[in-house]
Amino acid sequence: MVHHSGSIQSFKQQKGMNISKSEITKETSLKPSRRSLPCLAQSYAYSKSLSQSTSLFQSTESESQAPTSITLISTDKAEQVNTEENKNDSVLRCSFADLSDFCLALGKDKDYTDESEHATYDRSRLINDFVIKDKSEFKTKLSKNDMNYIASSGPLFKDGKKRIDYILVYRKTNIQYDKRNTFEKNLRAEGLMLEKEPAIASPDIMFIKIHIPWDTLCKYAERLNIRMPFRKKCYYTDGRSKSMGRMQTYFRRIKNWMAQNPMVLDKSAFPDLEESDCYTGPFSRARIHHFIINNKDTFFSNATRSRIVYHMLERTKYENGISKVGIRKLINNGSYIAAFPPHEGAYKSSQPIKTHGPQNNRHLLYERWARWGMWYKHQPLDLIRLYFGEKIGLYFAWLGWYTGMLIPAAIVGLCVFFYGLFTMNNSQVSQEICKATEVFMCPLCDKNCSLQRLNDSCIYAKVTYLFDNGGTVFFAIFMAIWATVFLEFWKRRRSILTYTWDLIEWEEEEETLRPQFEAKYYKMEIVNPITGKPEPHQPSSDKVTRLLVSVSGIFFMISLVITAVFGVVVYRLVVMEQFASFKWNFIKQYWQFATSAAAVCINFIIIMLLNLAYEKIAYLLTNLEYPRTESEWENSFALKMFLFQFVNLNSSIFYIAFFLGRFVGHPGKYNKLFDRWRLEECHPSGCLIDLCLQMGVIMFLKQIWNNFMELGYPLIQNWWSRHKIKRGIHDASIPQWENDWNLQPMNLHGLMDEYLEMVLQFGFTTIFVAAFPLAPLLALLNNIIEIRLDAYKFVTQWRRPLPARATDIGIWLGILEGIGILAVITNAFVIAITSDYIPRFVYEYKYGPCANHVEPSENCLKGYVNNSLSFFDLSELGMGKSGYCRYRDYRGPPWSSKPYEFTLQYWHILAARLAFIIVFEHLVFGIKSFIAYLIPDVPKGLHDRIRREKYLVQEMMYEAELEHLQQQRRKSGQPVHHEWP
């Protein structure tokens, strides 16, 4: 009998090939990485009869050896262990190919039939086919993992055997009988099993439970190129890796002596995450003998089964005609009202999890992740991925990474703020404004405004200094570098996750055409240069025409936003005179603050109202383009929504930052809108306080509104759904799928709203951070709540979403990089244009006491306020007063040769502003590019490991095929060759 250990070394010895030192390695010298989810099935113990058969394939001897070697034995030439000590642990040894033949036999078992034959098979036959010395030895107590598997297998058909993979819901009173009947008939013809059951609480509701059997799973897994495990991993180690391994061992021992980090999850609380380490390859029925199939029921994970069923639902016809296809169209026309995979059970248990363990993965996620008491803990990303799929897992991984990276940004921003707070009373500018009791400012409006003392702006000056001080430039540069570091290290983190979750080559293999695209362009086909198969094609002229229409719609919506901002500007101009003559003394005294606050609230209401229209218009424009794949559709829709909402949120902020008070003219010659309303001016301390107010209010109100819509609204809806259930029906009597039906569905656009909210927040945190250094702190506090709020929503308030796969966060990464570039430009303009940093700098080194480069005995900014205010003759205003008032500008006095013309200092400041913008941008962009160059997207060790695994996969596929051919020759009585025939 030829025995194969499954390693490259033994294979090459049989082949007479040379073996390099790098290939002589044992897996025990390295800690295995946890990569392939389908291997998770191997760590479970299954139901009683099934565990009896599968336990035959594992020996205690092989378990003690290197984890890559798979020692299996032949069923036709079984060898009994003849030692007395193995009496209670008898094991059969078979070859790798024999196990594959056994698994093939399962799929061809005559007792395993389709739905018409009740879809049952006699598992007892599997046990009787083997040599078993003592049947009593298999009566073992189920372990914690056993119970977890049984509980996590999800709801079942009435026979208690077939797992429910998907749920369809419709109303009995709906008249779309023919469409449903045709659709369900076609589903059965495709190999799915259906079972109908009426709702308990609502007699009008009917549920269709869907189960996908083994043969259908295999067929579609091959069609979709789903990667499945076929061999345990072996690892490459060199001298450096071994020395590093020893160092890690020493560090691990030292770490064990130290106190445990309270943020780290207790791994013992997640027994289901102990995965075997396997190589994976595209599934093929012709090469099924290559794959590790310990049990058919768990070979394909719940997420994979749901994805395959959904793929079939999306491509099954319900009427004659190429476009009459897909469950989504049936939901849109009312034939069905919902389609979703079921949750694995209740998320709460009457028994404490510490003593009785988790009832299912949903319960475990709630207790260890979604509860508010776990806000300080790391996220169980592997379990999130296992339950919700890789796409949602990547979202929470990115959100957690973003939140963690906000900690240093928030700390530095808080330090800048406290620096301004502690030095506020020592600010020369604030002191001069607060002491200017004899300086009168010109009226800020035409009718109801009067002269104001400069010291009336004392509070504004001190508050402005909190955000406009010496640390502003440093913080702007820091945040630009922070954004680059955040994105570059996220790319590395993403590459590690995609490798760990076996997503390296997924996009190339599994991306399929959208049914709508296929139905629209089925008459125009071209040969795909990659696959060599014909597929529908969208002509270039048609694509360009649709894109032009879509772009026109985008510009129209952006114009609508700008129009709304213009309306708010007009409102500010109209009401500022009304507030200046208001009866309430507080509003009359602080009329500028009241005008800004009211405008911010109105602007926020307009933002929320326009958002309702944006989503529908973006949806229509995206469908008009007919994207080729689902990822293209999601990227196009996400880009439109981002452009709409970004302009909607930030247009008013851009107005305040770069236009407010810039084009007002001067006393006696003010610029007016429509020759009627005088343009708004900044108060003597500048416009930065208006920008801070606008950002703070919008950021705060929007976060509250988003949190309410994400959690409060679903809570109210779910409460109302439960309230409508008939009285006298206990929750325990309602099946899981009916409880899921009473939950709210995940929105139609998936994670788009979640990403959009965070990306817009990232824009707030970086684009105008020079004006609002507390933005990272507010974002951090919000995200700590956001993670648990989203977790609670996914686990308890939403139906289980389709466990979709993804390799990255999609178009959002490019948008984040674009925001990082825009942030450098806007912060340069905010510092140079909006703040008074450049005028103070020019005065300090050109016009102030320190201009002569002599060691001064007084502050270099002494006299700055008086220098920054120009004079105007009150007699020219027609107010019946004489003397002079002051206004913010650099113009000549009335007694000069060129009164009210710009002075030389104005042009010096303008040149300094432009020079600062150029120097700042080039310096920061250079630093960002250098950092991005230093940080590779994929760690070198991971890159080498991926290349090594590709090589080993080819070798192992060759070895497995050779084993299979040898087994076939042995059965047919032909001589066994150790090389290819």
UniProtKB/Swiss-Prot annotation:
Put simply, this protein is called Anoctamin-3
Instruction: State the InterPro entries in the record.
Output: Anoct_dimer, Anoctamin, Anoctamin_TM
Q: Which disease is it linked to?
A: Dystonia 24: A form of dystonia, a disorder defined by the presence of sustained involuntary muscle contraction, often leading to abnormal postures. DYT24 is an autosomal dominant focal dystonia affecting the neck, laryngeal muscles, and muscles of the upper limbs.
What is the membrane topology here? Multi-pass membrane protein
Q: Where is this region: Disordered?
A: 1-33
Where does this protein come from, organism-wise? Homo sapiens (Human)
Q: Locations of Polar residues compositional bias?
A: 1-22
The record's subcellular locations are:
Cell membrane
Extracellular-facing ranges: 425-469, 572-592, 662-761, 832-914
Tissue specificity remark: Highly expressed in the forebrain striatum.
Query: What assembly does the database describe for this protein?
Result: Interacts with KCNT1/Slack.
Which purpose does this protein serve, as stated in its record?
Answer: Has calcium-dependent phospholipid scramblase activity; scrambles phosphatidylcholine and galactosylceramide. Seems to act as potassium channel regulator and may inhibit pain signaling; can facilitate KCNT1/Slack channel activity by promoting its full single-channel conductance at very low sodium concentrations and by increasing its sodium sensitivity. Does not exhibit calcium-activated chloride channel (CaCC) activity.
Which sequence ranges are marked TM in the entry?
A: 404-424, 470-490, 551-571, 593-613, 641-661, 762-782, 811-831, 915-935
The miscellaneous annotation reads: The term 'anoctamin' was coined because these channels are anion selective and have eight (OCT) transmembrane segments. There is some dissatisfaction in the field with the Ano nomenclature because it is not certain that all the members of this family are anion channels or have the 8-transmembrane topology.
Q: Report residues carrying sugar chains.
A: N425, N448, N455, N866
Pfam families in the cross-refs: Anoct_dimer, Anoctamin
The Gene Ontology CC terms held by the record are: plasma membrane
State the Gene Ontology terms under molecular function.
chloride channel activity; phospholipid scramblase activity; protein dimerization activity
Q: Tell me which parts of the chain lie in the Cytoplasmic compartment.
A: 1-403, 491-550, 614-640, 783-810, 936-981
Catalysed reaction, written as an equation: a 1,2-diacyl-sn-glycero-3-phosphocholine(in) = a 1,2-diacyl-sn-glycero-3-phosphocholine(out); a beta-D-galactosyl-(1<->1')-N-acylsphing-4-enine(out) = a beta-D-galactosyl-(1<->1')-N-acylsphing-4-enine(in)
GO BP field: calcium activated galactosylceramide scrambling; calcium activated phosphatidylcholine scrambling; chloride transmembrane transport; detection of mechanical stimulus; detection of temperature stimulus; establishment of localization in cell; monoatomic ion transmembrane transport
State the UniProt keywords alphabetically: Cell membrane, Disease variant, Dystonia, Glycoprotein, Lipid transport, Membrane, Transmembrane, Transmembrane helix, Transport
Chief place of localization: membrane
Lineage runs:
Eukaryota, Metazoa, Chordata, Craniata, Vertebrata
